[in-house]
């Protein structure tokens, strides 16, 4: 299953400048997702991170992975009055810098679901090189 930006906007509660998933290229809802974040020089965070040497903040790479994970939980089905909230981040590692012009590939695989908590193994890559990874837990709750 694929998502265009219109589908993503309907699925996630985020909006500009904090919507960090541009396209979903593969999604098996409740199992796995592969999505894209196109990193452009026009991103507002590049104004201060860092002038003259723009680098995507690691925390926003993790947020991109968390947003992709939320789409994986929800799929294209609109779940009225429900939202996926980030619960925890474990073992986050940042391996390479992400800069303007990069296409960030976001992959998340559900490892387990227990008592409504979804645990994902997440990897972000650029040109098939791992740039970040983390284990992310999230929960589906009422808005």
Curated annotation (Swiss-Prot):
The keyword Ribosomal protein does not apply. GO terms for molecular function: (3R)-hydroxyacyl-[acyl-carrier-protein] dehydratase activity. Its EC number is 4.2.1.59. InterPro entries: FabA_FabZ, FabZ, HotDog_dom_sf. Disulfide bonds: none annotated. GO terms for biological process: fatty acid biosynthetic process; lipid A biosynthetic process. Its main location: cytoplasm. It comes from the Bacteria. It catalyses: a (3R)-hydroxyacyl-[ACP] = a (2E)-enoyl-[ACP] + H2O. Belongs to the thioester dehydratase family. FabZ subfamily. This is 3-hydroxyacyl-[acyl-carrier-protein] dehydratase FabZ. The lineage of its organism: Bacteria, Pseudomonadati, Pseudomonadota, Alphaproteobacteria, Rickettsiales. The gene is fabZ.
């Amino acid at each position: 299953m694929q998502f265009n930006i219109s589908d993503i906007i309907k699925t996630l509660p985020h909006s500009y400048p904090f919507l960090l998933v541009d396209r979903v290229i593969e999604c098996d809802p409740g199992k796995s997702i592969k999505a894209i974040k196109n990193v452009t020089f026009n991103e507002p965070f590049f104004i201060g991170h860092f002038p003259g040497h723009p680098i995507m903040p690691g925390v926003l790479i993790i947020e991109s992975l968390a947003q992709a994970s939320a789409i994986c939980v929800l799929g294209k089905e609109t779940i009225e009055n429900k939202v996926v909230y980030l619960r925890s981040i474990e073992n986050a590692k940042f391996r390479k810098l992400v800069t303007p012009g990069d296409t960030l590939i976001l992959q998340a695989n559900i490892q387990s679901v227990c008592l409504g908590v979804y645990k994902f193994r997440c990897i972000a890559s650029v040109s098939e090189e791992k740039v970040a990874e983390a284990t992310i837990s999230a929960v589906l709750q009422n808005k």
